[in-house]
Amino acid sequence: MTAIRGGSRRAPGLALALLGGVLLGACHGDENAQVNALPGFVSGSVRKTAYDGASDDLLTAGLGKTGLGSDTRPGFANPAQPSAAELRRLAIYSNYRALVDITPNGGYGRFWGPNVDLAGNDTLGEGKIAGTEYLAYSDDGSGRKNVTLLVQVPASFDPANPCIVTATASGSRGVYGAIAAAGEWGLKRGCAVAYNDKGGGNGAHEIGTGVVTLIDGTLATASSAGSSSLFTASESSSTLAAFNSAFPNRYAYKHAHSQQNPEQDWGRVTLQAVEFAYWALNEQFGPVVDGTRHGIRYRPGDITTIAASVSNGGGSALAAAEQDTRGWITAVVVGEPQINVRMTPGVTVEQGGAPVPSFGRPLADYATLANLLQPCAAAAVAATGAPYLSALPMGVTQSIRTQRCATLAAAGLVSGADTASQASDALAQLHAAGYLADSDLLQAPMWDSQAMPAIAVTYANAYTRSRVTDNLCNFSFATTNPVTGAVAAPAVSPMTNLFGAGNGVPPTNGINLVFNGASGGVDHRLATPDASFAGAFCLRQLWAANQLGIGTNVDAVRVAANLQHKPAIIVHGRSDALVPVNHASRAYVAQNSATEGRASQLSFYEVTNGQHFDAFLSVPGFDTRFVPVHYYDEQALNLMWNHLKSGAPLPPSQVIRTVPRGGVPGAAPALSTANLPPIVQSPGANAIAVNAGVIDVPL
């Protein structure tokens, strides 16, 4: 590991976290200087580490295709104090598996995986990729932003034909969050990959001990880390001590509790990741100008750069392309983007020639509504047979559904004299709010898995710039008793391996979402018979009544859907129940056509039987009904590459009508090309019509 000096801040012990370090000199400046100078936003040292492609590598951290596919996750020599290298290995393992179906029958090793080349053939063996990593913080000088930037340069990078692919983290994941979604394709293509964690980065602060994470996942106390922590709660030590006394075993999380509404900067930090990648490539391939320092070989626009990723990372790529004023980004390819669109009058989303009931709502709106209604809607007849995605006994879950329906009815929020009719009304309200009937079987697992409650709580905190001490709507993050769900001290602190195993949005890695009631904090599902309805209703009211500045902060994250005529592809699963296609991709495409008109180069591919979490596809009931959207994300990247490099036309917007695998839940037959029709140049009746602010998607 080589540490390249940047600004003045240093994380204690960071230079010792990886072995073999020496220091090189560098300075801040701009790309017009003769010397390749670090961008001014880079704070502290840049750490450069080479990987041989055998014992360790860029894509699999030395695990290879076999190791990533194994259910046995990599361990630590000393479980109480894992090394930075061990935490990196676990982070790559965990994040890779979190975004794709890792089962052979589901397509791993056949359609994707380290062994599969870009033509879809099994030719790459274990798929380890040698190369170099550059790691640093981006900050505004306060030491409180500390966005993690990471550039991977594969040994196959061709300086004469340079390319960059962005891989902004999805969700609130750490910096390796999109390694499977975009990083893998970029590395195989021989491109540098520009990662960033969006200012969330799985950063946590254990309030009771004061322990925080550093840039490489190793731990320090908040006082010793200072401004070099990934995240430290902003409250004074005395305030945190008082809070810990009243609410022990609690955790602050960066996305939820940084008070910075980080989403408003996701486009900007993605552009910074690209600029940092330019610096790294100039550092590695630029001419030596004074015997030690490198000059500039690549200037903005010189490198073919595809902004790519999925979910929040996909939204970040779109925002970056909109904000790009210097030519950093050449094209965009994103999957299931979580994007909040600033809709203008006259823009319309239609399906089958008829306007959809609702479109273009921001996440703060649809997520708080879904979190309120989903536990009840899950009991609707139309949701019968939904995959079960909860560790709770089915009887407990059924009771939650019945009680949530009853409480909603008592509050006048659903109608009906019995659970069945109340549940049908709850589901009808979700339909009226823009959720498609294609998502009916996913309403239950989105709530049962706690994906929707986690999103609702984290984003409500972020959009209201709340502190951990606020216990917004009486929710907080804590370790709990595995039997009762009551807040309890952990047997082993979850902080030890948080960087490697956490996802940045509790519940994760043993840190759970709890509701603070009269009897103390309890897992929100078990705190009251109706699964903490009061808290869910409070979250909904934040948006409905525009409380605590939520409207202003949501407006700050909205985008204009102006891609500045850059070629772009959006892929989205029609059945997505986490980021509904009406509110995200369809709305974005419609608004883009109003904004850019005929100059738009955006194609939209909507995948039937596609949903948000490919990692769920091995779960019984998911395997038989849904197909991998990731397969089409990779096809879209190939299409864009061919467009940029050989002028091949991008296929027009279309519905891709996939075929579910079928069979018995939990034992679906192997995925095959019969399930996955290609994206075509002439979609015929499957063409999506987009014109002058109106999108019409075939039924």
UniProtKB/Swiss-Prot annotation:
Function description: Participates in the degradation of poly-3-hydroxybutyrate (PHB). It works downstream of poly(3-hydroxybutyrate) depolymerase, hydrolyzing D(-)-3-hydroxybutyrate oligomers of various length (3HB-oligomers) into 3HB-monomers.
UniProt catalytic activity: (3R)-hydroxybutanoate dimer + H2O = 2 (R)-3-hydroxybutanoate + H(+)
Subcellular location(s) per record: Secreted
Protein name: D-(-)-3-hydroxybutyrate oligomer hydrolase
Major subcellular site: secreted
EC number: 3.1.1.22
Keyword Cell membrane: no
Top-rank taxon: Bacteria
Pathway annotation: Lipid metabolism; butanoate metabolism
Residues forming the catalytic site: S311 (charge relay system)
Record Pfam families: 3HBOH
Organism, scientific name: Burkholderia pseudomallei (strain 1106a)
Family listed: Belongs to the D-(-)-3-hydroxybutyrate oligomer hydrolase family.
Signal peptide coordinates: 1-33
Molecular-function GO terms, alphabetical: hydroxybutyrate-dimer hydrolase activity
Keywords for the protein's UniProt record, in alphabetical order: Hydrolase, Secreted, Signal
UniProt KW Signal keyword: yes
GO cellular component: extracellular space
